[in-house]
Amino acid sequence: MPRSQRNDNFIDKTFTLVADTSLQVIPTTQGEKKAFTYYRDGMSAQSEGEYAEASQNYYEAMRLEIDPYDRSYILHNIGLIHTSNGEHARALEYYFQALERNPSLPQAFNNMAVICHYRGEQAIQQGDFETSEAWFGKAADHWKQAVLLAPGNYIEAQNWLKITGRLKD
């Protein structure tokens, strides 16, 4: 039984009902419908911290989904799981793959910037200021892209860019 049919949360049930109804009305193939079901179940598992189950669902969705735009969101969510698990290098790979398919995904740029900023902070703690500047530079580049795509979002990133003098580059 799909996860979405096991959920007791009212909001999730409502979303599932609306999504299922939309899938019946909008012309889609069986593969696309199945991919969406796996994606939806992956999101549900991920929101509950069930990362292994979420990953399995996302990989199944990737196997079935052919649309690059839809695949970008699946890849982004896989990146989120790797970020949550502290696997930053793998997370960055998935965010890059998501952006290859959808260059207008500000949350992927933001998440890459957060990882780069974190690595810059780690380098400072290790006394490696040259490496920290390189990581902070990458963070700035990614945050600039995120802010460009979603100007009203990422206020903290905008403030960091201003405070550190990186906004004008």
Curated annotation (Swiss-Prot):
It is a peripheral membrane protein. The keyword Protein biosynthesis does not apply. Keywords: Chloroplast, Membrane, Photosynthesis, Plastid, Repeat, Thylakoid, TPR repeat. One of its GO terms (cellular component) is chloroplast thylakoid membrane. SUPFAM superfamilies: TPR-like. TPR repeats lie at residues 35-68, 72-105, 120-153. InterPro entries: PSI_Ycf3_assembly (IPR022818), TPR-like_helical_dom_sf (IPR011990), TPR_rpt (IPR019734). It is found in: Plastid, Chloroplast thylakoid membrane. Its main location: plastid. GO terms for biological process: photosynthesis. NCBIfam families: PRK02603.1. Essential for the assembly of the photosystem I (PSI) complex. May act as a chaperone-like factor to guide the assembly of the PSI subunits. Belongs to the Ycf3 family. This is Photosystem I assembly protein Ycf3. It comes from Huperzia lucidula. The lineage of its organism: Eukaryota, Viridiplantae, Streptophyta, Embryophyta, Tracheophyta. The gene is ycf3.
